[in-house]
């Protein structure tokens, strides 16, 4: 009962006018901070992992950790495959118990994107697994995938409806001006495009590349239909910078149980702020 699909989470968010944050985890400490903070704020959250994260930690290990922590805190959690591209990889993880998948075929031409996504949807829905897909493509780097800004393109609102109907997806990730990674300057988000997409598509919408966005921008996207906010780089940066600072100030430190506390504290600040920005505190 504790490891759940994201479908009900996102449908609840759509009805309630808030968003559910999906935090990309990279190690045990990241997961601890996300779950502990979410439980203390009674907020729904999604534990997301790229293919690199699942390779690093092991699918069975991640599933066991999420299940154990959900039970420990009596807090339902979803574990989500972020930016997965290979059908066989997705199928193996679904059979291991994952109940939320993002199939990313956004780099393919429109018809091929539909075909690849529909194959995954048809398989996943047999296991009551929710499926997210992306139309349009964000710039920046996610895991081992690098997309140059010149190759990034925005979601076409009319195509979005055709894509959603043809694939049977449960949520749609849109490209409206965000990018993976942190921003050198504030991005100019295309809110009118997002509003048009919302008019064409009634599915929960997903925003990738939210690290570093202002509270105002995040909350405006939620008003216009975003139900899931993805955060990865902001957590990594908080962790690594706090750790570097601590070890610079305490070069004699050798015990990870001590020096990782500063990194956890920095991530806790990020997680609590994102939950507040999403308006999901008290919604679990």
Swiss-Prot record:
InterPro entries: Aldolase_TIM, Class_II_FBP_aldolase, FBA_II, TagBP_ald_KbaY/GatY, TagBP_aldolase_GatY. Dihydroxyacetone phosphate binds at residues 181, 209-211, 230-233. GO terms for cellular component: cytosol. Pathway: Carbohydrate metabolism; D-tagatose 6-phosphate degradation; D-glyceraldehyde 3-phosphate and glycerone phosphate from D-tagatose 6-phosphate: step 2/2. Keywords: Galactitol metabolism, Lyase, Metal-binding, Zinc. It catalyses: D-tagatofuranose 1,6-bisphosphate = D-glyceraldehyde 3-phosphate + dihydroxyacetone phosphate. PANTHER family: D-TAGATOSE-1,6-BISPHOSPHATE ALDOLASE, D-TAGATOSE-1,6-BISPHOSPHATE ALDOLASE SUBUNIT GATY-RELATED. Forms a complex with GatZ. This is D-tagatose-1,6-bisphosphate aldolase subunit GatY. The gene is gatY.
């Amino acid at each position: 009962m504790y490891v759940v699909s994201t479908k009900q989470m996102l449908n609840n968010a759509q009805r309630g006018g808030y968003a559910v944050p999906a935090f990309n985890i990279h190690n045990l400490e990241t997961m601890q901070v996300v779950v502990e903070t979410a439980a203390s704020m009674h907020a729904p959250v999604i534990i997301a992992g790229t293919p690199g994260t699942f390779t690093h930690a092991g699918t069975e290990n991640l599933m066991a950790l999420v299940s154990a922590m959900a039970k420990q805190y009596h807090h339902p959690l979803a574990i989500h495959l972020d930016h997965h591209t290979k059908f066989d990889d997705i199928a193996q993880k679904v059979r291991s118990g994952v109940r939320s998948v993002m199939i990313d075929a956004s780099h393919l031409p429109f018809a091929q994107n539909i075909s690849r996504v529909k194959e995954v949807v048809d398989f996943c829905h047999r296991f009551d697994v929710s499926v997210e897909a992306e139309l349009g493509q964000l710039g920046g780097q996610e895991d081992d995938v690098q997309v140059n800004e010149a190759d990034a393109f925005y979601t076409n609102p009319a195509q979005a409806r055709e894509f959603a109907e043809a694939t049977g997806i449960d949520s749609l990730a849109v490209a409206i001006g965000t990018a993976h990674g942190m921003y050198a300057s504030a991005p100019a988000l295309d809110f009118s495009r997002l509003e048009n997409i919302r008019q064409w598509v009634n599915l929960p919408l997903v925003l990738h590349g939210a690290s570093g966005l202002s509270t105002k921008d995040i909350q405006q996207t939620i008003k216009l239909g975003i139900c899931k906010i993805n955060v990865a780089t902001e957590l990594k940066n908080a962790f690594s910078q706090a750790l570097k600072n601590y070890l610079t100030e305490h070069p004699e430190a050798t015990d990870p149980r001590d020096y990782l506390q500063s990194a956890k504290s920095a991530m806790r600040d990020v997680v609590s702020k994102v939950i507040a920005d999403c308006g999901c505190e008290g919604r679990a």
